[in-house]
């Protein structure tokens, strides 16, 4: 259910970026279109119920070009999702981009 609610917000363009996420999308050359593609096929891989922005999650999704993206966003609040941060996961730090490697 939560991923479907997040997808619905993205389909209806009911989302916004934190300043950090906007900066990171520019620095890491991640387009809005790629973010939408990743959310559409994505899965929640981590849950952050006590995050400072409110309950949020980490989504792993692939773009049309098969680029893996991690997108941390809030669960819908007042029909809006806030993207907190986003990045292309480092395979040295993630197993199959889904599970954190032990350091």
Enumerate the language-model features and the residues they cover.
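Ribonuclease/tRNase effector modules and their secretory precursors
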Residues: 1-103
């Amino acid at each position: 259910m939560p991923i479907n609610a997040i997808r619905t917000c993205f389909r209806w363009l009911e989302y916004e970026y934190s300043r950090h996420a906007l900066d990171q999308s520019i620095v890491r050359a991640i387009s809005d279109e790629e973010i939408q593609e990743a959310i559409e096929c994505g899965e929640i891989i981590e849950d952050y119920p006590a995050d400072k922005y409110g309950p949020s999650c980490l989504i792993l999704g692939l773009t049309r070009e098969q680029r893996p993206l991690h997108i941390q966003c809030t669960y819908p609040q007042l029909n809006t999702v806030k993207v907190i941060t986003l990045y292309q996961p480092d395979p040295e730090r993630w197993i199959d981009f889904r599970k954190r490697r032990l350091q």
